[in-house]
Amino acid sequence: MTEDWQSQKFRQNVISKIHDLLPPNAQDQTKNAGVMENHIFRKSRTKDEYLGLVAKLFMHYKDMSRKSQQQQQQQQQQGGPPPNAEMGGGQNMMQDPLNALQNLASQGNRNPQMMPMGAGGGAPVPGGPGTASNLLQSLNQQRPGQQQMQPMSNIRGQMPMGAGGAGAQQMMQVQQMQQGGNAPGVMNVMGAGGGQNQGQIVGNPGQQMGVGVGMPNQMVGPGPNSGPAVGGAGGPNAAPGAGGPGPNQMQGGPMNVNAMQQMPPMQQIQQNQLGMGMNPMMRMGQGNGMGGPQGMPGQGMQGMPQGPHNVVGGPAGQQQVGGAGLPPNAVQQGGMNPMGGMGVNMPPNLQQKPNMPMGQAGQMFPGNRGGVGVGGQQPGQPFMRSSPSPADAQQLQQQAQLQQMQQQQQQLVVGNQTPTQQPPTPQMPTPNMIPSPALVPQSSPQMMQMQNSQRNIRQQSPSASINTPGQVTGNSPFNPQEEALYREKYKQLTKYIEPLKRMLAKISNDGTNVEKMTKMSKLLEILCNPTQRVPLETLLKCEKALEKMDLISYSGQQFGKSSNPLLEVINTTLQSPVANHTLYRTFRPTLELLFGTDITAPVPAKRPRVEEKSTSFEQEVPHVLQGEIARLDTKFKVKLDTTSQINNKAIRLICCLDDKRLPSVPPVSVSVPEEYPWQAPDCSLAEQEYSATPFLQTVQQALIARISKLPKNYSLSHLLDTWEMAVRQACSPQSKPRAVCELSTLLGV
């Protein structure tokens, strides 16, 4: 019964419960519920883990519903905009259920120790402060084997909001987490509608680095022995005055990479990214997270390897913050995907990985309009989390529609749009242009390849899809399963590229069938350009069309694809009907020179032909008899009597009379002696045949009488003529035949 949780019936029941739990305004609830359940199933090894993750999901949605009601009440009391107001549009973002689920699933692989958190106040901000509540409080529930979590209170982060392009400088409250040992850096980010914002990472004061994010930001790299250096309003957190550091200005020297590498792995920091219009539950994969007891699952700040790329948002290390006058497609750092209608792609190392613990990376939350908060660390300061809550269903539906319209408009005007209320800074010619990665100091290869031994999660290179200026793209319409299927199908169709090129070359040379050439050109363009994404159905149609085509005749080969001309010529020759003859004629002389001629067996000796013994007839029939038979009249039919040729040297012939003017009579047997023609042949009649009728008896008597009157030596021809005259005499109308004399016999009358 322990394996019944893997059955389809059990899983379908869980999917239906998740489906009922989802908000009624969520789009495509069936798909989202199925995707979340499938993700939990793949992450779970036992039934307890499976049920535990499902229970956490239920608690998460219930907690979100409760906090949504609390935030709506706070908004009504304060009269300010919702904390998840989007830049340029002020639209609420709906949480991605799959991202929330991935954050929940990470709880099964973490054993963190929660540090005490207090409440920190923020300075009042003109225009009304924004509120941020705890989003994933349910994730902090204690699991078996985890240590008890300290109490935590909600912290209201003061999000600066400019008043339509005002030049006021605002500062966001510091987000911190206590850790023992060396003091990690603290990053403060200030955002205003149109003014300058300054963010500082306070660590080693002698190591500072400016990062161009469209506003002059200062960053101080953390040092191993640096103490806490957080001042008041006039300290390091103060906004720069006239003559302050310019954008992208290096202060002091480069970051001390060795110092960062020397920091203990348990003292790792990771920033919280607050992107305008970003999906609240989007996770930024910054590499290998911290798996020690000081990791904080579900919080806004998680463990991260100490590396050079741990500077303001990942490898690219830049974040651009636009005020109220900027277009709604506020550019995020390093090609991060806002997932909420922004035309920016997220590189693979920032995407969600199913095998990465979800609590490992930082969370991205939408803050107040015009402000971005980046979490850091500082001893002695309370920890703050920014957590939005979804608004009512009506607003969410309107937001989704407006975001789609804005995304389409942004993609059309990207690269040539100018700001309406805030002039562009020198670092960013146009507000919707993504800063190039070349502007940010690159991290060393050793730090990029550093892995956490407790997690052993590989960090992907961001070079595959880092966006450069003018290369802003939209969100990918494929989920991971469809993406893998699309790439596999595209890889299978690449074998048709060379045959298609040859077919197009042949058709273009012929100058006929222009329509077919156009279709082939479109197919070739789809196959040769991997960046041109087409629907998977279109790719399947292309595969069917390519399978129906006779590409073998154009490819010149039926197996394999080779770039060697010699192999192609040999393959073409082998397909010829005279291939064997061609190979024999081509290679036989060479093989004979190399190996010599083949040693064959000796020719057998000629044996004399054994002559067959001829019959006695062939030996004894003289030519005189053969000539006489050949000259007989056609009415006489003569053939050999083979039955009497064994022991008798005489030749026995059977003679038939075939004359249409005479009646049919039985044949006679003639025996030709060996001494013929010097000895007369002998004629014998069959007694039974010639005594059958009176007519035949008359023929027999007449023949005997005539033979008796013949001379001593007569020939075969004379004997046959006598037989004919005997038949004629028997046919005479005279009843009594005349006496035959010798003269009449000789004359044949």
Curated annotation (Swiss-Prot):
SUPFAM superfamilies: Kix domain of CBP (creb binding protein). It comes from Drosophila melanogaster (Fruit fly). Coiled coil: none annotated. Residues 229-246, 368-378 have a biased composition (Gly residues). This is Mediator of RNA polymerase II transcription subunit 15. Residues 69-78, 393-420, 441-463 have a biased composition (Low complexity). Residues 63-95, 221-253, 351-479 are annotated as: Disordered. Its main location: nucleus.
